Curated annotation (Swiss-Prot):
GO terms for molecular function: (S)-2-hydroxy-acid oxidase activity; FMN binding. This is L-lactate oxidase. The keyword Nucleotide-binding does not apply. It holds the Pfam family FMN_dh. CDD domains: alpha_hydroxyacid_oxid_FMN. Its EC number is 1.1.3.-, 1.1.3.15. The keyword Oxidoreductase applies. The active site is at residue 262. Residues 8-367 form the FMN hydroxy acid dehydrogenase domain.
Length: 370
C-alpha cells in the first residue's frame, strides 16, 4: 500500500491508497479486519496488488490521441468507461445507507454496480436509484430457492447474474477471528434470510464437517447448467483462475467470465488474477467477454488489465474506503479518480481508445499460462 496519505486543499484524500489510510483510521479493529483481511496469512491479498507492480508500461510515441475516450461495450451496451463496482456483502457495516449509498456513487459515475447476494439493503430500495446493476448470486441447495433470488433481483432491475463459484464454503480468515469480528444483529443478508434453509446433514462419528456437511450443498456443473437455462438474463461466472475451467464454463452456457480470487478472502496462496488473465483470455478465444478483479488501485492497473484482454475491471475494497470516508461522494470520487488516471495513462501510452490498449504496451509481464 502506498503510504503518503496525501490530501487536497479541502482535506480530502487524493489517491485510492490515501482513501484506504483514512478509512482505516475510522474503523474499529474488528471491522477493519473484516474489510481488509484475507484467508489465512493473507498472502494472496498482498500478491493481488504486488502483481500489478511487476508489470511495466512501454509507451509508444507520436500517436494522435485528441478526441480520445474510455468508452467500451459491456454485455452489448455502451459504457462510458470499463470500471465496475464489485459485489461486496453487508455494506451497512460501513455506512448507514449501505448498498444504496454505493448505488448512488456508481450512478454518479455511470458505473455498473454488482449487488451482492448478501446485501444488507433490500434490492427494492436500491431499485429506486438510477443506474445499471448486475446481481451476484450464490447458488442455493434448492433450485427453487435460487430462482426465487434470481426473480427478485431481475424484478429489481438486474440485467445480468454473476454466479460466484470459488466459495462453496467460507475460507479461514485468521485476522477476523483474532479481532473477534461477528456480524451485528442489525446487519443481515436480507435476501437470504427470507429463504427456507435446507436441513443440516446429521453427521455420524468420524464424518467430516467439511466434506460430509458443508460440501453436500456445493453447486455442481448440472446445477449451473440448469440455472443458465432458466435464467431470464445473461449469466457470468466469477472466480475462474484456470483456462480449462473457463472453456468448460462456456460449454455449460456461461456468457462471461470474471477472473478472480475473491479478493484473497477464500483461499490463500492462489495466484493474483492479473497473472492468470492472459491465459484465460487466450483459452476463451473471444467466445465470451472476460473481466478481472483483485488488487486494482490505479488507473494504470486498469490499463494493464485491458492490455491483457479484460473487457472491464471490477473494484471492491476501494469503493468501500470512499464510502467510509465521505459516503456516496467519497465512493464516487474513488471511481472518478480511477477513470481520470486511466485517461492519463492512455494518453501517455499513445492510446486514444480502449481498443488501442494492446499487450505490446506492457513490459515485464509473465503469466502462468496454466
Amino acid at each position: 500500500m502506498e503510504s503518503a496519505d496525501l490530501r487536497d486543499p479541502d482535506g480530502m484524500p487524493v489517491t485510492l491508497s490515501d482513501f484506504e489510510i483514512d478509512a482505516a483510521g475510522r474503523l474499529s479493529a474488528d471491522l477493519l479486519a473484516y474489510l481488509e483481511g484475507g484467508a489465512e496469512a493473507g498472502q494472496s491479498v498482498t500478491e493481488n496488488r504486488a502483481a500489478f507492480g511487476r508489470i511495466g508500461l512501454l509507451p509508444k510515441l507520436l500517436s494522435p490521441c485528441a478526441g480520445g475516450h474510455t468508452r467500451t461495450t459491456i454485455l452489448g451496451k455502451q459504457a462510458p468507461h470499463p470500471i465496475m463496482v464489485a459485489p461486496m456483502a453487508f455494506q451497512n457495516l460501513f455506512h448507514p445507507q449501505g448498498e444504496s449509498a454505493t448505488a448512488m456513487a456508481a450512478a454518479a459515475q455511470d458505473a455498473t454496480m454488482v449487488l451482492s447476494c448478501q446485501t444488507s439493503t433490500p434490492p427494492e430500495d436500491i431499485a429506486t436509484i438510477p443506474g445499471r446493476r448486475w446481481f451476484q448470486l450464490y447458488m442455493q441447495a434448492d433450485h427453487e430457492a435460487t430462482m426465487a433470488l434470481v426473480t427478485r433481483a431481475v424484478d429489481c432491475g438486474a440485467d445480468a447474474l454473476v454466479v460466484t463459484l470459488d466459495a462453496p464454503i467460507n475460507g479461514l480468515r485468521d485476522r477476523e477471528v483474532a479481532a473477534g469480528f461477528t456480524l451485528p444483529d442489525d446487519v443481515r443478508p436480507v435476501m437470504l434470510d427470507v429463504l427456507p434453509q435446507p436441513p443440516r446433514p446429521h453427521l455420524r462419528d468420524g464424518q467430516s464437517v467439511v466434506f460430509d456437511g458443508m460440501m453436500v450443498f456445493a453447486p455442481t456443473a448440472d446445477d449451473l447448467a440448469r440455472l443458465i437455462a432458466d435464467s431470464p438474463v445473461p449469466v457470468i461466472v466469477k472466480g475462474c483462475l484456470r483456462p480449462a475451467d473457463a472453456t468448460r464454463l462456456i460449454d455449460l452456457g456461461a456468457q462471461g467470465i470474471i477472473v478472480s480470487n475473491h479478493g484473497g478472502r477464500v483461499l490463500d496462496t492462489v495466484p493474483a488474477p492479473i497473472t492468470q488473465l492472459a491465459a484465460v483470455v487466450d483459452a476463451v478465444a473471444g467466445a465470451v467477454p472476460v473481466y478481472v478483479d483483485g488488487g486494482i488501485r490505479r488507473g494504470s492497473d486498469v490499463f494493464k488489465a485491458l492490455a491483457l484482454g479484460a473487457q472491464a475491471v471490477l473494484v471492491g475494497r476501494p469503493v468501500m474506503h470512499g464510502l467510509i470516508v465521505d459516503g456516496p461522494r467519497g465512493a464516487s470520487q474513488v471511481l472518478r479518480r480511477l477513470r481520470d488516471e486511466l485517461e492519463v495513462t492512455m494518453a501517455l501510452c499513445g492510446c486514444a481508445t480502449v481498443a488501442d490498449i494492446t499487450p505490446d504496451l506492457l513490459t515485464g509481464f509473465s503469466g502462468t499460462g496454466s
